[in-house]
């Protein structure tokens, strides 16, 4: 009964997703506009229970410009988190506020922010982008951008712009894919940004920012296998690397549910309303005793509350997919991107999950 109540709430959010006012940013090319707008967003949170106030302006009100026309510009795009009161000491930077959210960004918002970042890095004067997000969104934004963007320009996601700017400005930040900087100044590949539930210092950092704001790299530049140039995602699913898929194919509903004794018939009954499920494995090992699976919708199993764990396809029910080393949030993001692009077969999903 509890599960049915939760599912009813999840299905209700499918009718709550509406077009974002950020679309006006592209319609009117507001990045280069000389005026500004304040718009109340109707974007729902992932559970459809609340919305954010969106303010965007690229003229005089909410964009701070310390660049010169001749210099490359580092774009700081704010969706939450911490930014300095003034950035007058920083040259060649633009600050643009899209959201001021303290909630985890949903898939609609992630795609909307990606469209802004894409517009930014396509500009020849752009040296790269820093995206400031709240702590709840850091993992999702970092991983989402890692899949969406295939560029040599640095894109750095952070809770605090002061930590990320030295990284984005560092010449060795290129050719690494999207990076994230946590509040303890550790730098991660976006693919391996630690889950929010894990303690600081977890995961696989690639660098650290010292007290003098110098970046100390641990490894030579390279991209994780998941998103490398010869990966399945890059070679066979290049359509993943577009921030516009959501506009063409609609918003996917991919809930995260916890392991339990739910019948396959109940799961299959959701196939008309959800595009997939991520099941959080309750086992202390990589395997699961759960029987949740479906022939109608993709079901992906992931492990929670550990920096890194691996769930293989042989560890899950026959008609399900193992998320490999991806956390539930990362699995939800990848499954959502796949759904947006029509990639739903078990064999295809097995090829893109690690």
Swiss-Prot record:
Keyword Ion transport: no
Classification via PROSITE patterns: ASN_GLN_ASE_3
Keyword presence, Methyltransferase: no
Gene Ontology BP terms: cell wall assembly
Signal sequence, renumbered to the chain: 1-19
Propeptide: 20-37
SMART domains per the UniProt record, alphabetical: Asparaginase (SM00870)
Keyword terms: Glycoprotein, Secreted, Signal
Known glycosylation sites: 40, 50, 53, 58, 61, 65, 87, 94, 100, 106, 118, 172, 239, 286
Function: May be involved in cellular adaptations prior to stationary phase.
Record-given protein name: Protein YGP1
Organism: Saccharomyces cerevisiae (strain ATCC 204508 / S288c)
Source taxonomy: Eukaryota, Fungi, Dikarya, Ascomycota, Saccharomycotina
Gene coding for it: YGP1
